[in-house]
């Protein structure tokens, strides 16, 4: 926090930026990954609104790591006493996660995008990004601004 607190930060990604622009009219958009899974779930459990998981994909296409993460979120949320009406994509993501939950890194590593990232020397990034609950923060986008969520 000390590095970024009070500063404007400009970020661009190939897929995440497009997703954020597409969701700019949403009331708020929480940003999550395996790295902040537990923190994101705590925030979502406090939200009384409809929740939609928007996966960025890769170059406009489905990617395994997004589906695994969405499935992890759906799986955890469904274990609570909440009732959810799941879409087919939510059900499928959940099944994918349930099948691969003990080998997330290997599943991502063996995906098309995982092979690509390894081919350009970024396999260590895959391993890092498959870690669970490494950070206890949740970025939230409201309008065109991203800040840290202070809900939890």
Report each predicted region and the residues it spans.
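Glycine-rich phosphate/diphosphate-binding loops that line cofactor/substrate pockets in enzymes
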Residues: 43-51
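Short, acidic/small-residue loops that bind anionic groups at enzyme active sites
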Residues: 30-42, 80-85
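Short, structured patches in soluble enzyme cores that scaffold and shape functional sites
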Residues: 11-15, 33, 53-57
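Long, charged alpha-helical interface segments
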Residues: 1-14, 22-28, 48, 64-152
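Internal active-site segments that recognize and position negatively charged phosphoryl groups
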Residues: 18, 22-23, 38-44
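Active-site-proximal helix/loop microenvironment
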Residues: 53, 59-66
